[in-house]
Every structure is written in C-alpha cells, then in structure tokens.
Swiss-Prot record:
May be involved in the conjugation of reduced glutathione to a wide number of exogenous and endogenous hydrophobic electrophiles and have a detoxification role against certain herbicides. Residues 11-90 form the GST N-terminal domain. Keywords: Cytoplasm, Detoxification, Stress response, Transferase. The keyword Cytoplasm applies. Its main location: cytoplasm. Glutathione binds at S21, P22, L47, S48, Q61, I62, E74, S75. It catalyses: RX + glutathione = an S-substituted glutathione + a halide anion + H(+). The gene is GSTU11. It comes from Arabidopsis thaliana. This is Glutathione S-transferase U11.
Length: 234
C-alpha cells in the first residue's frame, strides 16, 4: 500500500510494478513527494500478467500508473503526469520552460546512456569488454557530476533545495550502481572523483519520500546473480 492522503478528486490510484525496477522506483518516489495515496501491486511476471497486458498491450512493461480508469505508461511520463496532476508537495519539474527542457534532456540521457552503461557492465564478458564497459559508465558519472554542479548551484539536489526530475531519474539508478560497485570493486560515485554526487547520494537516500521505497541492496545483489549469468556476478 502506498502513502499519504487521498488522491485528486478522490479518484483511485494504483501502481503496477516490480520491486527491483528502477523505473518503478521513480514513480513511487514521485507519488510520495506529492503525498498521493496509492495501491501498489507487485507484478512478478509482466509478460504474462493479465493486468499488464490489459493496460499496456503495446510494450507489455511496467510501471503502469492507473488513475481512475486511465492508464499512464513509461516512468518519466508518469513522473511528469504526477507533477502536473497533484499540486501538493514540492514541484518536481521547474516552472521555467528552459529549465524544464534541461531537466527532461538529462533524464533522457540517464536512460539512454547511464542505464544502458550499467547494463553493459552487468552483461560484459571477458576482461577487455568489462574494462571498456566500466570506462563508459565512469564517463557517464563524470558528466553527471558536472551536471549536478551546474544544476544544483551549490544546493543539495539537482532540483535545488528539493528533489526534482533529474534527482528522481538518476537516484533510481543508485541501487544497481551500488550492486556493480560490490562486484567490480570500482567506486563509480567517489568522494574524490565525484564529490557532488557522493554527498548528493547520501541526501537522496535519506529523503523521506525515498527511504521507505528504496530496494534492499542485498536483495538486489541476489536478484542480479540470478538475472545476469556473467563472470562479474560469480
């Protein structure tokens, strides 16, 4: 069961998800930030789930937010919908059109480059390929460190004083990053190489909207061992 107050217009809110998914985590954090009460339904097999096939017949993927009888799909799309639908809590996206465009750009970058780089390390085979995948992920972290310094302007989050769109997009990847750090021995978020991200991650983990829904790292470790049959996870 989710948190907080009744939803807008007393319409029922339901979230279909799976606990290891960083994309599902995004939607849960956004709902918590906006103090939205919702029912969370764990979907163990999305490919055969009747609910998933019914509400997302095209991609057959989670997360799916159901507001009343309306399904909203894709994690970033859901986060934007939550921000625009519920005015309670801090805004997730900036009000300035340019700043909104910047935030959306970086979340797309996180999905297209950082998340794919995380998966690239996880599935890499052979020392040369593993090292190349690690180097690519380190480049992503270096660029996000620069982005944090620019967007935060000396404050605690990418979004300024509060968690924003980029925080949610990247923060949802912290669990998988930590799992990779455990198995590779590489610190992708390091106090010397990425000091801004290092301290940001502590603040993100501790946030009241985040802490209750972050997956347990040891459970993620076991999940990764089962999902990825590569030498990294042996």
């Amino acid at each position: 069961m989710g948190l907080m107050n009744r939803s807008k217009n007393d319409e029922y809110v339901k979230l279909l998800g799976a606990w290891p998914s960083p994309f599902v985590l995004r939607t849960r954090i956004a709902l918590n930030l906006k103090n939205v009460a919702y029912e969370y339904l764990e979907e163990e097999d999305t490919l055969s789930s009747e609910s998933v096939l019914n509400y997302n017949p095209v991609h057959k993927q989670i997360p799916i937010l159901i507001h009343g009888n309306k399904p909203i799909r894709e994690s970033l799309n859901i986060v934007m919908y939550v921000d625009e639908t519920w005015l309670s809590g801090p805004p997730i996206l900036p009000s300035d059109p340019f700043d909104r465009a910047v935030a959306r750009f970086w979340d797309v970058y996180i999905d297209e480059h950082c998340f794919t780089s995380i998966n690239g390390v996880a599935v890499a085979k052979g020392e040369e390929n593993i090292n190349a995948a690690i180097a690519k992920l380190e480049q992503c972290m270096a660029l996000l460190e620069e982005t944090f310094q620019e967007c935060s302007k000396g404050r605690g989050f990418f979004g300024g004083e509060n968690i924003g769109f980029i925080d949610i997009g990247f923060g949802s990847m912290l669990g998988p990053l930590t799992v990779l750090e455990k198995f590779t021995g590489v610190k992708f978020i390091h106090p010397e190489n990425t000091p801004g991200l290092f301290h940001w991650a502590d603040r993100f983990y501790a946030h009241e909207a985040v802490k209750p829904v972050m997956p347990d790292i040891e459970k993620l470790v076991q999940f990764a061992r089962l999902k990825f049959n590569t030498s990294i996870f042996k």
